[in-house]
Amino acid sequence: EYGQMIQTNAESLLNYVNSILELSRLESGKIQYEDEECDIIQLCSEVLDKVNGREESTVSVSLQTDLKEQFARTDRRWFDTLLVSMLTPSENDTARYEAIIRIRRDRTRSALYFDVVNAPFAKVHFENKTSLIRHEINAHFIHYFGGIYKVQTEAEEGSTISFTIPC
């Protein structure tokens, strides 16, 4: 029993330290994003397949958009990491989530608007330092590509993370 507690605490500490190091490398410019043209709808579909395909997952995700394809400049790997982090509950969270990723395009502002509704990660925005740092990492990524990142823990439909990407 004590061994399990030590193992769990050690893993949490390691995640925390790794998150701090990652944020530090981002802020110092030591990590460079790949700036490439990507089909955002395809990337979202791949993340949905990954999250919905997890064994014993407590998260089910659906995509709501009228867009068949939409290209934008981003880093494919970091975009994947961004969405997966939003859809991953914290270690001790056993609640079930029916998350929705909504995407719409605003032609006048040349931007894609994303709402990740009922996102498990939005619920823990200020819960612990590790999640706070992960939100900072996510925001850094979105800001790098000219977007906005916002967490709403008390949104009407459920905890929501909203962000934009220029297109």
Predicted regions: what they are:
Residues 20, 24-35:
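Helix-loop junction within the histidine kinase core
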Residues 101-102, 146-152:
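Glycine-rich ATP-binding loops of the HATPase_c
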Residues 34-39, 58-70, 106:
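Conserved catalytic submotifs in the C-terminal HATPase_c
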Residues 98-110, 117:
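Short beta-strand/loop element within the Bergerat-fold HATPase_c
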Residues 8-13:
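Short alpha-helical segment of the dimerization/phosphotransfer core of two-component systems
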Residues 112-135:
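Glycine-rich/acidic phosphate-handling loop/turn and adjacent ATP-lid/helix
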Residues 137-146:
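Conserved glycine-/histidine-rich ATP-lid loop and adjacent helix of the Bergerat-fold HATPase_c
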